[in-house]
């Protein structure tokens, strides 16, 4: 009975095994693909062009697309749509992009993970130019990260068009709260926390490190704030029924 429960728990991963094997050998050299470093949960492939490059130690399950599965969002796995761009993962980083998420990389897009990265659920990463993530980056639920507007605006007094894309750079040890929108040209320094439902759209490095950003658009809310991934736990306390 215990073995059956384990099989049932991982049934979607087992059913996706043919796609997992194909995806690894499609994108990686044999010596890396044989380790199955990329696991996929309920994958849906739109385009599987471009490349994925892994540098550093490579191990089984190092990269997880489509899980963990969060009960607050639909159990829809991951949408992968690479039109011909590159995903580059260095330093043996562990990557996790949760369920109900999607990754789109344009022909000229370049997504760079320089360290461990986690997106809980319903993350949408859209890269038409360049997106860089530092070490130990945590993305809350329902985040949108896009380096492109997909439409160019023109000023009535200027014949030239507006550049509709710009690189995004996220520093080390950054926590971005749920339902935040990160737009083109965003540059976050290391050791910052971004409040929920924030809109990021510019260079925030002049604020320095250890700050809390929030608002629409974002501004500095407080100094001396940081997120430490090594001590990120909450000690919940039961309700005292005598006080109810």
Give the positions of each predicted feature:
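Domain-scale signature associated with acetyltransferase and cell-envelope carbohydrate enzymes
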Residues: 1-146, 167, 171-173, 180-182, ...
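Short beta-to-alpha loop/turn elements within the nucleotide-binding domains of ABC transporters
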Residues: 186
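Flexible glycine-rich beta->alpha loop in the catalytic core of nucleotide-sugar glycosyltransferases
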Residues: 150-151, 198-199, 205
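Short helix-loop boundary/capping segments
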Residues: 145, 150-155
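Conserved beta-strand->loop/alpha-helix structural units within folded catalytic cores of enzymes
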Residues: 177-178, 183, 196-197
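Short acidic, glycine/proline-rich loop/turn micro-motifs
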Residues: 155-159, 225
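A short acidic, glycine-rich active-site loop
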Residues: 159-168
